[in-house]
Curated annotation (Swiss-Prot):
Belongs to the gamma-glutamyltransferase family. Pfam families: G_glu_transpept (PF01019). The active site is at T37 (nucleophile). InterPro entries: GGT_CS, GGT_lsub_C, GGT_peptidase, GGT_ssub, Ntn_hydrolases_N. It comes from Homo sapiens (Human). This is Glutathione hydrolase light chain 3.
Length: 225
């Protein structure tokens, strides 16, 4: 995932003018949505930062608690695959995700700390929301650093998501119709999301200090001291 070759390969498949059928992207994995995830973004008064995402995967995880600590165990390996078995999400087995020694469960979590060339933290961000996490963390970063939106707008801006399987671009109901039209011009199949798309938490350095936003999609509010 972090190799320059892999990044270049993905970049070569992206076009500003059109999307493509699933087969064009040569998919090798499928990640089911999860439901037991939370994200926390923190900046201390000395400028040190923490971006932490925690998950038990599905609601109530493995549904098994430790008899000693009472901690609920996760069921993270359900995001992986077993040969000859289709998982509960209807996903066929993928060799890339077979359970093997030394491997980690497949995850979408991407807690992020953006640092400037001066070494100072510029943005702390992350999200909860299954396969939507990566997309919407990236969107919050793009909205703030590229488009210049303040952190509140970057977090609250209507979002979209496409996880390739199925090859449908889901958009939030209040997204600008011009965005949907532009997607369809590029041959995207769009549909309105039945609920919100992911939940983002972000902190951004400003000229006067720090600004924080907690996604109202799930009733969140930022806190400071």
């Amino acid at each position: 995932m972090t190799s320059e070759f892999f990044a270049a390969q993905l970049r070569s498949q992206i076009s500003d003018h059109t999307t493509h059928p699933i087969s064009y992207y040569k998919p090798e994995f499928y990640t089911p949505d999860d439901g037991g995830t939370a994200h926390l973004s923190v900046v201390a008064e000395d400028g040190s930062a923490v971006s932490a995402t925690s998950t038990i995967n599905l609601y109530f995880g493995s549904k098994v608690c430790s008899p000693v600590s009472g901690i609920l165990f996760n069921n993270e390996w359900t995001t992986s695959a077993l040969p000859a078995f289709t998982n509960e999400f209807g996903a066929p087995p993928s060799p890339a995700n077979f359970i093997q020694p030394g491997k980690q469960p497949l995850l979408s979590m991407c807690p992020t700390i953006m640092v400037g060339q001066d070494g100072q933290v510029r943005m702390v961000v992350g999200a909860a929301g299954g396969t939507q996490i990566t997309t919407d963390t990236a969107l919050a970063i793009i909205y703030n650093l590229w488009f210049g939106y303040d952190v509140k707008r970057a977090v609250e801006e209507p979002r979209l998501h496409n996880k390739l399987l199925p090859n449908v671009t889901t958009v939030e109901r209040n997204i600008d119709q011009a965005v949907t039209a532009a997607l369809e011009t590029r041959h995207h199949h769009t549909q309105i999301a039945s609920t919100f798309i992911a939940v983002v938490q972000a902190i951004v350095r400003t000229a006067g200090g720090w600004a924080a936003a907690s996604d109202s999609r799930k009733g969140g509010e930022p806190a400071g001291y």
